[in-house]
Amino acid sequence: MMRRLLLVLLPLLAACSGAAADAPKPAIELTGRVVDKAGLLDSATATALTARLARLERQTGVQMVIATTPTLGGKAINDYSLRLARSWALGSKERNDGLLLLVAPTERKVRIEVGKGLETVMKDEVCDQIIRRMMMPHFAAGDPQSAILAGSGAMIEVLEHRPARKVAA
C-alpha cells in the first residue's frame, strides 16, 4: 500500500518541483521602494523618493514602488507591469492595495499598475491624467527625473486624499 502511494506521489512531486523551478523570475529584482534600473534618477532624488514612499506606507498602509527598466524586452507594458507587481507581491494580500509606477524609456512607455483594493481611488482616468498631464510634458522636455517626481507626487497626493495639482494641458 505504501509503495503504491509513493509510486503515485513521486511523479506529482517531481512535476511540482519542476514547475516551481520553471516559474518566471521577475524581470527586475525588487531592491527597495525605488528600483531605477534605467538610471533615470540621481541618488539624492532616489533617496528622497524612498523616504516619501516609506512615509506614505506608514501613513496610509499603501505600498508603492517606483521602477524604471531600460527596456520591456518586446513585451507590452501592461503585461510587463502586471507581472512585475504580482511577482513583487506589492501591497497587503488582504486589501490588494499595491501600486507600481513603471517607466520604460527605450519604448517611451509609462504605466501605473493599481491593485484592485485601490481602484476606487486610483481610477483609470486618474492614472491617465497623471501620466498625460503631469509626466508627459517633462518627458517631452527630456527630463525624466522631473516626470517621475511629478507623477509620483500626484499619485501620493491622490492617495492622501488631497486633490492632485492641476497642470494646464
Language-model-detected regions and their locations in the chain:
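A structural boundary signal for the start of the first folded domain, especially the loop/turn
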Residues: 2-169
